[in-house]
């Protein structure tokens, strides 16, 4: 079940990375800024950068330490720097709140790195949402996930290799993150690109690192053989119109701002794509061009639905007094005489929009 909360192990570090990338983007952190290492961060065992309390480490090195070395200590250093109260626990609460804003409704964080805790849980769907947002929101940093090694200042040379087993297999794999604990088993959030097609997948609960590597490779090969990219909607397409209440126009077009393409099965898709426009109307004037007014919900043969924002294709100002009177009359007529043909209303010169009403 993709929505069942499970122990995510180190895959939850992707949330710490997302929030660190946000902090760099909005200026709360600088990529060349150095951060201190607390005793609590240095005390972490497991996968590590082997930091100690005498270190001051750049944000860039810490990001590589989390991505490539899966450093529990590096995650904690970033967490303490970003937390409002300077603690990892405080940062974990921020992670949970931010996850909700991103639509990750089945994730709860108790630390920055996936250290075992019975209440630290993520669903596989939430991990997929997070991976997609990392790729979409921070493409500049995505190449870090495909780096094969990182020897932080030469210490512990044996601990310098990326743990992602699908990198370098020649199948287009270029991210994201592995994870392992006794409770979680072996897992991976992975991504691969071949041509203009990209897939993101999540595996959890594997019995061994070898099984994880084999299953991840199988998924990539299967996905690119069995699925094709299909353009569903072109940017700028008006897919529906919505009635406007008290506007200087009776309706407004609902359009999509970005292309939408889906990976669809090569077999059995002839009539499998359906789309539904969802909005609450009539829309009250004024309406601003680009204002989100609804969603288009796309379903494909029982696969998870995709939702695309629908925005206004133009500005619609408030109508003048006569236009508002005409609109009210039409609504009242439709409410109280729905079966009677509506008579033609005479055209009236519209009053200025600032006329008293």
Question: How would you describe each model-predicted region?
Answer:
Residues 104-108, 116-121, 125-357:
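Domain-terminus/edge residues, biased toward the C-terminal soluble/receptor-binding domains
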Residues 1-138:
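Active-site-adjacent loops and short helices of periplasmic peptidoglycan-processing enzymes
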């Amino acid at each position: 079940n993709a929505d069942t909360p499970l122990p995510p192990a180190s895959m939850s570090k992707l949330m710490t990375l997302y929030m660190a990338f946000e902090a760099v983007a909005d200026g709360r952190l600088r990529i060349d800024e150095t951060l201190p290492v607390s005793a609590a961060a240095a005390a972490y065992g497991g996968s590590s950068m082997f930091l100690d309390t005498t270190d001051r480490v750049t944000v860039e090195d810490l990001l590589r330490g989390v991505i490539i070395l899966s450093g529990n200590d590096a995650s904690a250093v970033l967490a303490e720097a970003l937390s409002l109260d300077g603690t990892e626990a405080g940062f974990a609460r921020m992670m949970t709140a931010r996850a909700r804003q991103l639509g990750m409704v089945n994730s709860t964080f108790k630390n920055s790195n996936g250290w075992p805790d019975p209440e630290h849980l993520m669903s596989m769907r939430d991990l997929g949402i997070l991976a997609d947002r990392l790729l979409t929101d921070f493409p500049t940093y995505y190449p870090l996930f495909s780096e094969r090694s990182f020897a932080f200042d030469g210490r512990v040379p044996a601990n310098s290799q990326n743990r992602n087993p699908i990198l370098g297999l020649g199948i287009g794999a270029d991210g994201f993150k592995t994870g392992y604990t006794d409770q979680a088993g072996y897992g991976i959030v992975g991504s691969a690109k071949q041509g203009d097609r990209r897939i993101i997948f999540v595996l959890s609960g594997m019995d061994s690192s070898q099984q994880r590597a084999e299953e991840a490779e199988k998924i990539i090969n299967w996905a690119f053989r069995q699925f094709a990219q299909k353009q569903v909607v072109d940017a700028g397409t008006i897919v529906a119109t919505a009635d406007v209440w008290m506007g200087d126009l009776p309706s407004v077009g609902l359009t999509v701002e970005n292309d939408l393409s889906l990976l669809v099965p090569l077999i059995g898709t002839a009539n499998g794509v359906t789309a539904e426009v969802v909005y609450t109307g009539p829309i009250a004037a004024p309406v601003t061009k680009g204002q989100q007014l609804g969603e288009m919900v796309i379903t494909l043969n029982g696969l998870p639905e995709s939702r695309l924002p629908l925005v206004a294709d133009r500005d619609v100002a408030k109508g003048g007094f006569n236009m508002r009177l005409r609109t009210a009359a039409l609504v009242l007529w439709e409410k109280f005489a729905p079966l009677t043909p509506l008579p033609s209303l005479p055209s009236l010169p519209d009053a200025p929009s600032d006329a008293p009403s």
